[in-house]
Curated annotation (Swiss-Prot):
Protein name: Nicotinate-nucleotide pyrophosphorylase [carboxylating]
Function comment: Involved in the catabolism of quinolinic acid (QA).
Keywords: Glycosyltransferase, Pyridine nucleotide biosynthesis, Transferase
Pfam families: QRPTase_C, QRPTase_N
Lineage: Bacteria, Pseudomonadati, Pseudomonadota, Gammaproteobacteria, Enterobacterales
């Protein structure tokens, strides 16, 4: 039976709780970058070209296909700039498939505020939708296998929870949210601890409920990790045949994760070896933003 202490799905609830705390701060930081260190829309000198009492209606559309993500970040941008004076009419929800030229949402409110918040709101949606779209592509490549796609901690600074939420919207699952929710024992940890067994035993003693993962670079290290009782074993830069042998040797005694050299060309091949997880750092560190635009009507 697979180890009982590891289930990526449980991280979903943890992440959603963290999102509630992180969104206001992330949005405030983004607005301060645009508004001279404040969240005061009056600092937008170009927007002052418009009459102070002018109100406008705007529509945000996508210029390419993808998966939408970022609804709550958009809402928070305009809440911080104008309280409840901006109305948002949503045509999509997080996780929805979107098509080129589709209207995503409409905005009605003070013209100055709509223009001031435009770039910050679109930055969040473009980035998060880009991640969700790439994840969905990878997830579709895994259809018919028993392998689950995971993200990593390789995220853009300040956007950890947001990017991991986008992974969920794309259909993937979360690896560690940070350094406090699971052990990932690598070469330097093993050297400092004395051995794989000593590192795993101490980890299990320190935090009995936390999953213990060990990264290995060859089949001999895999055997050591299995004997030590690791919950998950990460196969780092293994060749495909080595992965098959690792699955055979493990025989359900631990969960296996593949990392390294993963692209949309190799993903399916790796999954068909029978590993449990494939983690891809590029999902959240090489972000290609979705092309969106806002137009006044």
């Amino acid at each position: 039976m697979p180890p009982r202490r590891y289930n990526p799905d449980t991280r979903r609830d943890e992440l959603l709780e963290r999102i509630n705390l992180d969104i206001p701060g992330a949005v405030a930081q983004a607005l301060r970058e645009d508004l001279g260190g404040t969240v005061d829309a009056n600092n937008d000198i170009t927007a002052k070209l418009l009459p102070e009492n002018s109100r406008s209606h705007a529509t945000v559309i996508t210029r390419e296909n993808g998966v939408f993500c970022g609804k709550r970040w958009v809402e928070e941008v305009f809440i911080q700039l104008a309280g409840d004076d901006v109305t948002i009419i949503w045509h999509v929800d997080d996780g929805d498939v979107i098509n080129a030229n589709q209207s995503l949402f409409e905005l009605e409110g003070p013209s100055r505020v709509l223009l001031t918040g435009e770039r910050t709101a679109l930055n969040f949606v473009q980035t998060l939708s880009g991640v969700a779209s790439k994840v969905r592509h990878y997830v579709e490549l895994l259809e018919g296998t028993n392998t689950q796609l995971l993200d990593t901690r390789k995220t853009l600074p300040g956007l950890r929870s947001a990017l991991k939420y986008a992974v969920l919207c794309g259909g993937g699952a979360n690896h560690r949210l940070g350094l406090s929710d699971a052990f990932l024992i690598k070469e330097n940890h093993i050297i400092a601890s004395g051995s794989v067994r000593q590192a795993v035993e101490k980890a299990s003693w320190l935090h009995p409920d936390a999953p213990v993962e060990v990264e290995v670079e060859n089949l001999e290290e895999l055997d050591e990790a299995l004997k030590a009782g690791a919950d998950i074993i990460m196969l780092d830069n293994f060749e495909t045949e080595q992965m098959r042998e690792a699955v055979k040797r493990t025989n359900g005694k631990a969960l296996l994760e593949v990392s390294g050299n993963v692209t949309d060309k190799t993903l399916r091949e790796f999954a068909e070896t029978g590993v449990d997880f494939i983690s891809v750092g590029a999902l959240t560190k090489h972000v290609q933003a979705l092309d969106l635009s806002m137009r006044f009507r």
